[in-house]
């Protein structure tokens, strides 16, 4: 944290602009061709690995970037979370056709809901057709013609004869596209601080994929046949087809929404856990950079105070299988940049614990869903210290008033089992070691909750 915060003092006090990939773990960590060993039968319903799990991503001067595909939708792999700031271009896997423009999936597979193929970004590669990613000996069933050095737009003239160029995807591809927009902005106005750059990216961003929560987002296998605005049953650990909304995130609820879609907060900003504030318009961003040059009073200082956390709750015993109010936090009359929560627990199943926050203005944000990769037996966590989460969904709101922090807790006795089926999902379940033997109450569990508002 100290090193990342120290970046604010560089570039003659204007701060380094740090653009960072969100991650490629929507469905899984360590994905193999058609399987995942990480997030069980609900993989594909929501992000397997929260982008906020990387503590660097909680720092406001880190511009966390998601990936978009050629359809204008979230790339199948792009990690989600409430710390996303912006979305760049990442594409899919480009594994078929001359240039990756085709899908190698059959019509039947596509009809089943399979996805994860299609165009991607092109970049340079190690020279020669025997080194790097672009290779003449690549498997033609999994590699497009350009990547093998044999594609031709003009008969007899190969496009990539020396395999000097390759396809590139992932949020590692999306982040450089945002860096390119930033470079254009700084070329137009080198005096911009890191906060100016981040603000202009938000101001120039456009909403994409409106209503995405009403469809499915599958990967290479049809993980889910229910839309993302469905209900998650916290007792059965199952996704239900009924449409949900944020009002169902309330104390005592046993069913909660999986995804809230694009929300408009009290400051009038639109935000999404899939896209952050959206996709920036490079031309508009440059126009704004020039406006900041013409009107320097718009500029924000590169320095930003990060307050200490405030204790919110110190609980003995924990209730699973429902939504509970963990505690409240009193905000002062500041303008919110990011709201953060920090958790410390013992004898408590982190994979069964989700966190939601409600601002004094009534905006709600899902900071973490239960049944994520921490529920998997290979990554099960029952004791944790200083586990941090954050959200930009409240950005620009007045912090004055009472903030509510909710636990969204699933059934720890119905966690996903390790992958075992040869031809599909394993439906077996495991029990978290700290789960109560029966009922929903874990009297031995402890949970300390802290919160803070990082102001603009």
Which ranges hold each PLM region?
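Extracellular S/T/G-rich loop segment that most often corresponds to the catalytic His/Ser-adjacent loop
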Residues: 45-183, 273
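Solvent-exposed, polar/charged alpha-helical surfaces in well-ordered, non-transmembrane soluble domains
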Residues: 4, 8, 176-183, 195, ...
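Loop/turn elements at helix/coil->beta-strand transitions in domains of secreted/extracellular proteins
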Residues: 9-18, 59-64, 82-84, 193-194, ...
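Active-site-proximal beta-strand/loop segments in catalytic clefts of secreted hydrolases
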Residues: 20-25, 65-70, 80-81, 88-91, ...
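C-terminal subdomain of the subtilisin-like protease fold in secreted/lumenal serine endopeptidases
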Residues: 1, 15, 61-62, 152-168, ...
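Substrate-binding/access-modulating region of protease and related hydrolase catalytic domains
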Residues: 1-59, 71-73, 158-177, 188, ...
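Loop and turn regions of beta-sandwich accessory domains that flank beta-strands and are enriched
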Residues: 290-456
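Residue-level detector of buried hydrophobic side-chain packing
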Residues: 6, 65, 86, 172, ...
């Amino acid at each position: 944290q100290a090193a990342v915060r120290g970046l604010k003092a560089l570039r003659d006090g204007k701060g380094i602009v740090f653009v960072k990939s969100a991650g490629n773990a929507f469905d899984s960590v360590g994905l193999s061709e058609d399987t995942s060993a990480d997030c069980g039968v609900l993989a594909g319903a929501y992000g397997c690995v929260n982008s906020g799990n990387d503590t660097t991503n909680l720092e406001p001067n880190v511009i966390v970037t998601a990936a978009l595909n050629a359809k204008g939708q979230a790339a199948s792999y792009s990690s989600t979370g409430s710390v996303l700031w912006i979305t760049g271009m990442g594409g899919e896997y480009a594994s078929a056709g001359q240039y990756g423009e085709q899908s190698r999936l059959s019509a039947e597979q596509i009809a089943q809901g399979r996805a994860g193929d299609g165009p991607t970004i092109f970049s340079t590669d190690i020279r020669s057709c025997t080194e790097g990613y672009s290779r003449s000996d690549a498997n033609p069933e999994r590699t497009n013609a350009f990547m093998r050095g044999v594609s031709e737009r003009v008969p007899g003239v190969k496009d990539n004869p020396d395999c000097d160029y390759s396809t590139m995807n992932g949020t590692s591809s999306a982040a450089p596209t945002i860096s390119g927009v930033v470079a254009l902005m700084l070329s137009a106005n080198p005096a911009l601080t890191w906060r100016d750059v981040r603000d202009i990216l938000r101001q120039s961003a456009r909403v994409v994929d409106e209503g995405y929560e009403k469809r499915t987002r599958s990967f290479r296998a049809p993980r889910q046949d229910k839309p993302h605005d469905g209900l998650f049953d916290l007792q059965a650990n199952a996704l239900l087809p009924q449409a949900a909304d944020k009002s169902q995130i309330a104390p005592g609820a046993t069913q909660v929404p999986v995804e809230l879609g694009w929300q408009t907060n009290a400051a009038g900003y639109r935000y999404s856990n899939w896209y952050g504030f959206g996709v920036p318009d490079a031309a508009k961003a440059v126009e704004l950079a020039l406006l900041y040059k013409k009107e320097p009073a718009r500029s924000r200082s590169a320095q930003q105070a990060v307050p200490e956390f405030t204790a919110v709750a110190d609980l003995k015993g924990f209730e699973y299988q429902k939504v509970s109010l963990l505690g409240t936090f009193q905000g002062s009359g500041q303008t919110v940049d990011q709201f953060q929560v920090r958790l410390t627990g013992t004898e408590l199943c982190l994979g069964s614990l989700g966190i939601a926050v409600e601002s004094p203005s009534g905006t709600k944000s899902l900071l973490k869903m239960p049944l994520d990769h921490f529920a998997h037996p290979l990554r099960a966590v029952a004791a944790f210290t200083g586990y941090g989460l954050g959200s930009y969904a409240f950005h620009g709101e007045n912090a004055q008033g009472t903030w509510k922090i909710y636990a969204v807790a699933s059934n720890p006795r119905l966690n996903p089992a390790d992958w075992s089926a040869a031809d599909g999902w394993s439906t077996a379940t495991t029990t978290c070691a700290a789960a109560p033997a029966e009922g929903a109450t874990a009297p031995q569990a402890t949970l300390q909750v802290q919160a803070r508002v990082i102001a603009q």
